[in-house]
From Swiss-Prot:
Name used for this protein in its record: NADH-ubiquinone oxidoreductase 24 kDa subunit homolog C11E3.12, mitochondrial
Keyword Mitochondrion: yes
EC class (word): oxidoreductase
Residues that bind [2Fe-2S] cluster: C88, C93, C125, C129
Annotated family: Belongs to the complex I 24 kDa subunit family.
Length: 162
């Protein structure tokens, strides 16, 4: 029986390029980038066909791939109906927001993001402390945020989506 291919030909080439970065004995280290590639191709979650193909490419068991997905449920098993905004809730970002006069940054962010149809969740430090308050939308981290900047970002993202 011929295995079912999950990756499109162009993404299969990317997957092979990702694997080529790692020595043969350590190709399991490529699992997170491969899962990310599969998620980008499929949408928002990792289907079983992708797990099987990734396991085959990396030379690991399907159980190993599945256990890695279970270790990162918010990244690989989450099936959002809407895009999401992750707000950094570290004390550095909270202090930066206070210094900018945004003492209620979290609630401002939530009200603006939900108005534009985004889900909002808190996250740990985004490593952008020098530009707080920080937030993470899709693959980009935004820093030195204000309510006005957030509105501009939301409008740009919703226009790009339409």
């Amino acid at each position: 029986m011929k295995p079912i291919r999950f990756f499109k030909p162009e993404n299969l080439q990317l997957a092979k390029a990702i694997l080529a970065r790692y020595p043969l004995r350590f190709q399991s280290a490529a699992l997170v980038p491969l899962l990310d590639l599969a998620q980008r191709q499929h949408g928002t979650w990792i289907p079983p066909t992708a797990m099987y193909e990734i396991a085959s490419l990396a030379g690991v068991s399907i159980d190993y791939v599945h256990s890695l997905i279970l270790a990162y449920p918010n990244d690989f098993f989450w099936r959002p109906k809407k895009p999401r905004v992750r707000i950094c809730n570290s004390w550095m970002c909270q202090q930066a927001a206070e210094e900018q006069g945004n003492s209620n940054w979290d609630s401002q962010c939530r009200s603006v993001a939900t108005k534009y149809g985004f889900d909002v969740e808190n996250t740990g430090c985004l490593g952008n402390c020098f530009q707080g308050p920080a937030m993470w939308i899709n693959d980009k981290i935004y820093g030195v945020n204000t309510k006005e900047k957030l509105v501009d970002i939301m409008e740009a993202l919703t226009q790009k989506k339409n």
